[in-house]
UniProtKB/Swiss-Prot annotation:
NCBIfam families from the UniProt entry: F420_cofD (TIGR01819)
Gene3D superfamilies for this protein: CofD-like domain, CofD-like domains
Record EC number: 2.7.8.28
Annotated gene: fbiA
Alphabetical UniProt keywords: Magnesium, Transferase
Taxonomic superkingdom: Bacteria
InterPro entries with a match to the protein in the record: CofD (IPR002882), CofD-like_dom_sf (IPR038136), FbiA/CofD (IPR010115)
High-level lineage: Bacteria, Bacillati, Actinomycetota, Actinomycetes, Kitasatosporales
Residues the record lists as binding 7,8-didemethyl-8-hydroxy-5-deazariboflavin: 51
Protein name: Phosphoenolpyruvate transferase
Role summary: Catalyzes the transfer of the phosphoenolpyruvate moiety from enoylpyruvoyl-2-diphospho-5'-guanosine (EPPG) to 7,8-didemethyl-8-hydroxy-5-deazariboflavin (FO) with the formation of dehydro coenzyme F420-0 and GMP.
Subunit structure, interactors included: Homodimer.
Pathway it works in: Cofactor biosynthesis; coenzyme F420 biosynthesis
Cofactor: Mg(2+)
Length: 321
């Protein structure tokens, strides 16, 4: 079975770990990773979501944080601070720095982000084919109003420095409108047997991937069933700031509203948590097959069961049952 998953960072990576546990060695998983979170720091290109997927599936992630490297040290950051060089609010550890140095060196030498990502994955052996959504530069910005007035800030600043404490007024995936899907992205979607939307942020993760011209259209036109898992449980995000960015695009922070925002033209099936069982009827009335099942990724086995349920729903959709 050929499975394609569109994924952001922590939530996407943890779901993918469960998916790997749920499938067999004969199954092929292609992950189309969000690069809208990418940021340039200290002259280096940092790809937080790609790296989180790579580290998580490769066994190098800081489990408690869900991002960054295990057994990290911070000597470089401390030295940068002594030079008065920031930003202090964004933590890059020494081990993590090495990844960004290799990436930036290869990009400067003329390799594409796709080629660099493939090379980095040779070390980590994540068990999936990891593709960036685009080789072109796309960065998600958030329009806010604070004591400095109305302005746009990089998504990383909005989330890491401001902790999403200010309302998001608009989400702007800068560069997405002129970006092209990375090599292999459209082909993977067209050839997939199943397409999955993990419980990643529907606006700044999956939404940004879909903003690259051609990707949304390819998913909508794909013969494979498309099944998503709600990142919202009981009217609140499991983690992160999905409620803030959903409000910015005029969508309620409910499992039902997120499904309807994707729409029946894009997704065929939708899983909600048992806490949101009341949403099933409304989602199905819109033409999207819906089931209520436990969606908390408490451990790998619980997550694997979520993945198995998503794949089972895809089969039901495929056979019209």
């Amino acid at each position: 079975m050929r499975i394609v998953a569109l994924a952001g960072g922590i939530g996407g990576a943890r779901f993918l770990r469960g998916l790997l546990a749920a499938v067999g060695p004969q199954d092929e998983i292609t992950v189309i990773g969000n690069t809208g979170d990418d940021i340039h720091l200290y002259g280096l290109k940092v790809c937080p979501d790609l790296d989180t997927v790579m580290y998580t599936l490769g066994g190098g992630i800081h489990e408690e944080q869900g991002w960054g490297r295990a057994d990290e040290t911070w000597s470089i950051k401390a030295e940068m601070k002594e030079y008065g060089v920031g930003p202090e609010w964004f933590g890059l550890g020494d081990r993590d720095f090495a990844t960004h140095l290799v990436r930036s060196q290869m990009l400067t030498a003329g390799y594409s982000l796709s080629q660099v990502t493939e090379a980095l994955c040779v070390r980590w052996n994540p068990g999936v084919r990891l593709l960036p959504m685009s080789d072109d530069r796309v960065e998600t910005h958030v329009r806010i109003t604070d004591e400095q007035g109305t302005r746009a800030v990089h998504f990383q600043e909005y989330w890491v420095r401001l902790h999403a404490a200010v309302d998001a007024e608009a989400i702007i995936p800068v560069g997405a409108d002129t970006a092209k899907p990375a090599p292999g992205v459209l082909e993977a979607i067209a050839e997939a047997d199943v397409i999955l939307f993990p419980p990643s942020n529907p606006v700044v993760s999956i939404g940004t991937i879909l903003a690259v011209p051609g990707i949304r259209e390819a998913v909508a036109a794909a013969p494979a069933p498309v099944v998503g898992l709600s990142p919202i449980i009981g009217g609140a995000p499991v983690r992160g700031m999905a409620d803030k960015v959903l409000a910015a695009v005029g969508v309620e922070a409910t499992a039902e509203a997120v499904a309807l925002n994707y729409g029946p033209d894009l997704i065929d099936g939708w899983l909600v948590d048992t806490a949101d069982e009341h949403a099933v009827a409304a989602v199905e009335a819109a033409g999207i097959a819906c089931r209520a099942v436990p969606l908390l990724m408490t451990d790998v086995e619980a997550t694997a069961e979520m993945a198995r349920t998503a794949l089972a729903l895809a089969e039901q959709v495929r056979h019209g049952s």
